[in-house]
Swiss-Prot record:
Highest taxon of source: Archaea
SUPFAM superfamilies: Dimeric alpha+beta barrel (SSF54909), Winged helix' DNA-binding domain (SSF46785)
Name under which the protein is recorded: Uncharacterized HTH-type transcriptional regulator PYRAB04820
DNA-binding keyword on record: yes
PANTHER family (alphabetical): LEUCINE-RESPONSIVE REGULATORY PROTEIN, TRANSCRIPTIONAL REGULATOR AZLB
All copies of domain HTH asnC-type, residue ranges: 2-63
GO MF: sequence-specific DNA binding
Pfam families per UniProt: AsnC_trans_reg, HTH_24
SMART domains: HTH_ASNC
Length: 147
């Protein structure tokens, strides 16, 4: 279970994962060794799974975001999810309830790129149908959830 200090450390790292232990310690008024030990413990327990950066995907050529619902044969769902998850354009693969069995969020350079992806998904054994939504405007896209 996370205590208040762990939550504060995580909150700071979520805003800037490059911040030094010394800066975190100063901000929270604790010893640098405490910060080091807490972060190490959070990594070892799997709470922190790595340090990354936040990209502006449009600035690197991925101008199109799509959300795809996939209806699949029950016994093939896991295999389909694994195949789709390997594609570098795929941001998220969710096993869900409702009309569709799988929801995929992916980024593409253009409509042709998306079209090839959709056709590729439709060719996977066990995929019955897809429903693809093109995102017109990203209002919020932030997968960071502070504890």
């Amino acid at each position: 279970m996370l205590d208040e200090l762990d939550k504060k450390i995580i909150g700071i790292l979520m805003k800037d994962s490059r911040i030094s232990y010394r800066e975190i310690a100063k901000e929270l008024n604790v010893a640098v060794g405490t910060i080091y030990n807490r972060i190490k413990k959070l990594e070892e327990s799997g709470v922190i799974q790595g340090f990354t950066l936040k990209l502006n995907y449009e600035n690197i050529g991925y101008d199109l975001t799509a959300i795809m619902g996939i209806k699949a044969q029950g016994k093939k769902i896991r295999e389909i999810e694994r195949i789709i998850a390997k594609d570098k354009r795929v941001m998220c693969v969710y096993d869900v309830t409702g009309e569709y069995d799988i929801i995929v969020i992916a980024k593409f350079k253009n409509r042709e790129d998306m079209n090839r992806f959709v056709k590729g998904v439709l060719s996977i054994d066990g995929v019955e149908k897809t429903n693809t939504h093109v995102v017109l405007e990203v209002v919020k896209e932030d997968f960071r959830l502070e504890p």
